[in-house]
Design a protein with these regions (language model features):
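Class I SAM-dependent methyltransferase SAM-binding "motif I" and its flanking Rossmann-like core
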Residues: 100-159
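Conserved helicase motor
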Residues: 60-69, 142-146
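General beta-strand structural signal in soluble alpha/beta enzymes
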Residues: 38, 113-118, 165, 191
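A contiguous loop/helix-start segment that scaffolds small-molecule binding in enzyme catalytic cores
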Residues: 1-2, 6, 82-83, 162, ...
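Generic beta-sheet signal
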Residues: 8-12, 80-88, 136, 161-165, ...
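Glycine-rich, flexible N-terminal cofactor/catalytic loop recognition
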Residues: 1-64
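Short Gly/Thr/Asp-enriched flexible loops that form oxyanion-binding sites at enzyme active sites
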Residues: 94-109, 176, 180
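Short active-site oxyanion
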Residues: 30-36, 110-114, 162-163
Length: 279
């Protein structure tokens, strides 16, 4: 493969629904790129029209069904010196959207990858959810099959960080019901739909309450679901901690090992547990 000169892959952050959110850099790259790969070429044409941008480069489709086939040609074009832009229907490429395979292949070929950052449904939903944003994890779309979905939620039930999911309107009722069953109906959550669009809506409440709300009034449009992390377990009282240490020592553990194990089990400083047993 020829050496890369100015060739590169540029990931474009597209508006979630409001064209006014498009950055100046997005406009510039769309107008100047040699090749633009779009998840939906018709949506790209509408966006370009809304932004009054004339795309001078060649436009090709790039979506889940043709990623494997089209990736090599995009990487080859960038390796030959072309500026190749990738844009999805909304948000950042690679984040539950096409792009990951292209980025991996570009890195493997020594082709530079950069981004023109833009809107993200993940961080937008977090910001408006009213739930803790200091630590979070993005889980993408839950499994479609109920059994696999419940198993995924069971594995996440004790996750302390705020969780963010994408979900389709026709599956959100089942997803909320399974979350309420696995996490408990009172776990706080926010259902965010049609973010930045005219019919934007944020429904907040416990998972059980949201499940009932969705059953009565099914939402439409693109959905981002934000769920609070598992609450911290209450600290056992001093007598219970002493009893745990004593039980471990009776089972053969040394005093030091028993204290270490109890402190680790409850997320407490070792010296705090040691002080209780030394009194």
């Amino acid at each position: 493969m020829p050496a890369v000169a100015d060739g590169r892959i540029v990931l474009l952050g597209a508006p979630l629904g409001n064209p006014a959110d498009a950055s100046g850099r997005l406009r510039s790259v769309l107008a100047s790129a040699d090749l633009v790969a779009a998840e939906d070429t018709r949506r790209l044409a509408r966006l370009a029209s809304d932004l009054d941008v004339v795309i001078s480069g060649r436009v090709v489709s790039y979506f889940e069904g043709n990623e494997d086939r089209r990736t090599p040609s995009l990487v080859a074009a960038a390796a030959d010196g072309a500026c190749v832009a990738l844009i999805t229907d909304g948000g950042m490429p690679s984040v539950s959207d096409p792009g990951y395979r292209l980025v991996v292949a570009a890195h493997a070929a020594g082709v530079p990858v950069t981004a023109a950052p833009g809107p993200s449904a993940v961080t937008t939903a977090l910001a408006v959810s009213g739930l803790p944003c200091d630590r979070f994890c993005f889980e993408g779309f839950p499994p479609r099959r109920a059994a696999a979905r419940r198993a995924r939620f069971a594995a996440l039930a004790s996750e302390p960080r705020t969780l963010v999911f994408f979900e389709a309107p026709h599956r959100i009722a089942g997803t909320l019901a399974d979350l309420a069953g696995g996490f408990g109906p009172d776990r706080p959550a926010a259902l965010c739909r049609e973010l930045t669009k005219p019919y934007e809506q944020v429904r907040r409440g416990g998972l059980g309450e949201l499940a009932e709300s969705v059953a009565a009034d099914p939402p439409r449009g693109e959905i981002t679901l934000v769920v609070a992390g598992a609450p911290a377990a209450p600290r056992p009282d001093d007598a219970a901690l002493r009893a745990e240490v004593a039980a471990r020592r009776a089972a053969g553990a040394t005093g030091r090992d028993a204290v270490d194990a109890v402190a680790a089990a409850h997320g407490l400083p070792r010296r705090e547990v040691y002080r209780l047993t030394a009194d």
